[in-house]
Amino acid sequence: MVNGLSEVGIKPDYNLLVIEHTKYVDTLLKLGLKVDVLDPDDTFPDSVFVEDPALTFANGTILLEPGAPSRKGERGLIQPHLTQTFDTVFKLVEGSAEGGDVLRLNKEVLIGLSDRTNELGARALKKLLLELGQESRIVETPRGVLHFKSDCSALDEDTILATPQLANSGIFENYNVILTPENEYSAANSLRVNEKLLVPNGYPRTAELLSRKFDVEIVGITEVAKLDAGLSCMSLRW
């Protein structure tokens, strides 16, 4: 797990990382979710970030194809569990796409093109989403951003938390947008769970801003962030 991909270049502390993951799971349980924790696999150190190799909806799942070479094969780890859970299972067979580039909204699904999700994969994913009754739109992820959702998250049906650079692209012109404060752009990957809004630690101005409208809970992911990951990365939710 600590040997996962990282652009930050700082190796996380294994024991602290395990503690953060355990507290993350405990938080989801406390908020009323049923949580299945899969066994670790050292062959794929990034496999703890289960959001990337699959998408899950109430009526089915889509197995994706990660764009990072070291993550090829991760969907094979998660496939047995998802096929036991869902009657409808689709598999992306063209291009690459990672769940971190997919933002699910009430009216549509946004697919962000990035170094991990290419045009071929996005177009193939768009067709599979339609099979599940989901309209989608392909958009551009800002340069230098790992995943589309590194810079945004859905706070409710009509409200997006986004970095200024992503908000200024016009992608969210039909939504209400809350901008992350300067120097707190990584807080853009927050996570709405039922009535609670989970916000990563270390971003006090963002937490204060969001607490004016939402019930905020701070979740520690200091070590997780060293692996270029955020709150949404460690779970598949439906």
Where are the model-predicted features located?
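The feature marks the mature, well-folded catalytic cores of soluble enzymes
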Residues: 1-238
